[in-house]
Amino acid sequence: MTGAGGAVDIGIATYNIHKGFPLTPLVATRPSLRGLREHLHALNPDLVFLQEVVGAHDGHARRHRDWPRQSQYEYLADTLWSSHAYGRNAVYDAGHHGNAILSRFPILRWENEDISAHRFESRGLLHCEIMVPGLSANLHAVCVHLALTARGRSRQLERLRQRIERHVPVDAPLIVAGDFNDWTWRSRAPHEFAVPLNLHEVFEITTGAAARSFPAALPLLRLDRIYVRGFSVLETRVHHGRRKMRLSDHAALTARLRAQ
């Protein structure tokens, strides 16, 4: 938390957890929640941006003896992240899932905004205002999971831009992270969204390109992003490998930031 010379350092992670099931050649039959929790605890970030988090699922609770009694985000938070927020996006007969933010610091307020591009994909953005000791202004954190279609993503990025312009002061520190589903390398939509807001993608800063994060075993597609404002980037990493495939279809991304 405290860096060199008293600077404020923050560790963050973004992770699409695939509803708590691994990516396998066939249908996944065993949840990977225990392994996911161990993985996140080992990464030990201050803030975690999660996508495809199950808030409740009656069918899984009946079928799997080790299915947690609480929500997935509460189970993953355990004792490490005392503050958390959950945005319910997709609702079905058995339960619901969405995005979540886990935080070591107090979440002062939060809101989940429906940004679904059409009725076949339920998507949302989860916006939290967080009090981080040492920062002169509250941190704004936004977790997103965008559409599979380019047109849908473009509309959602515009909604995201509008929300940030309305609700986030221009001098406030800001992190936007999640699954942008932007698998086409020709796409300019994320860049066009970020530039007017003075947002910078952390892997583009450290490596020159967004991270390859999918599939987890041998990432090829650059689906996930971490955009920041008001921070310098100290370190970035993609946590991939065959063992990670047993946890989710995406690899987790982490970054170490220093407040400017």
Language model features with spans:
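Beta-strand-turn-beta hairpins that frame and shape the catalytic cleft
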Residues: 3-12, 97, 103-109, 121-143, ...
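Metal-dependent phosphoester-hydrolase catalytic domains
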Residues: 112, 129, 161-174, 182-260
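Active-site environment of divalent metal-dependent phosphoester hydrolases
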Residues: 19-22, 55-58, 92-95, 149-151, ...
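Surface-exposed cleft-lining segments at the edges of enzyme active sites
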Residues: 20-27, 57-59, 112-116, 143-151
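N-terminal, active-site-proximal structural segment of metallo-dependent hydrolase catalytic domains
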Residues: 1-79, 84-86, 91-96, 259-260
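Residue-level detector of structured alpha->beta connecting loops
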Residues: 44, 81, 104-106, 198
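Short, solvent-exposed loop/turn elements at beta->coil junctions and helix N-caps
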Residues: 87-92, 116-117, 239-243
